[in-house]
């Protein structure tokens, strides 16, 4: 049994980020916290094995306790950092990071060739919309916000497949 998520609205950016990744078999959630993102991914991809990693042993313990009985071993959590992931090379089809910046080289190491890295970032459970949101997104682009993420992707040898956000439904920036 998997416990229901407490923070489902905050996971909207993660849901949008993994819309187009097919059916991954092995998923890693970086900086998983108490497991909301990993639990969401387990529901979204019912045949996948989901692993969460977090630098805090306390949060890893809390996340593991939330999983409940998982006789299939589909969901598990480990302590680790984005710069030193405790997993073998070329292991995951999908690596996700919700409000965390993964270490590009280490992420590339654990991601299988052809796999996906989905980074979802927001500072609010509600996306910015309307005139104020459009103005802020325009201003962020002018200040180089997009190049920061695309540059980070390039550090690990990644190509940006999709960059979206701001409006509900993932309208492009």
Question: Where would I find each of the regions flagged by the language model?
Answer:
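Conserved class I S-adenosyl-L-methionine
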Residues: 23-33, 118-139
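Core SAM-dependent methyltransferase catalytic element
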Residues: 149-173
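Conserved alpha-helix/loop element of class I SAM-dependent methyltransferases that forms part
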Residues: 6-25
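A short SAM/SAH-binding and catalytic strip from SAM-dependent methyltransferases
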Residues: 93-104
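A short acidic, Gly/Pro-enriched loop at the edge of an enzyme's catalytic core
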Residues: 83-95
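Class I SAM-dependent methyltransferase SAM/SAH-binding core
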Residues: 36-83
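A short glycine-rich, Lys/Arg-flanked "PGG" loop and its adjoining helix->strand segment in the class I
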Residues: 103-116
């Amino acid at each position: 049994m998997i416990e229901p998520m407490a923070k489902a609205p905050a996971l909207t950016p993660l849901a949008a980020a993994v819309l187009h990744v097919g059916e991954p078999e092995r998923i890693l959630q970086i900086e998983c916290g108490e497991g909301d993102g990993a639990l969401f991914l387990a529901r979204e991809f019912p045949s996948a094995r989901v692993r969460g990693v977090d630098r805090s042993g306390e949060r890893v313990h809390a996340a593991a306790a939330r999983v409940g009985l998982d006789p299939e071993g589909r969901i598990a959590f480990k302590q680790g950092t984005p710069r030193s992931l405790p997993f073998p090379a070329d292991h995951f089809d999908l690596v996700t990071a919700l409000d965390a910046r993964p270490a590009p080289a280490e992420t590339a190491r654990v991601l299988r060739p052809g796999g996906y890295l989905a980074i979802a970032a927001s500072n609010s459970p509600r996306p910015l919309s309307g005139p104020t949101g459009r103005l802020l997104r325009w201003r962020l682009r002018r200040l180089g916000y997009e190049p920061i993420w695309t540059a980070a992707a390039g550090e690990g040898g990644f190509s940006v497949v999709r960059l979206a956000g701001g409006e509900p439904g993932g309208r492009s920036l």
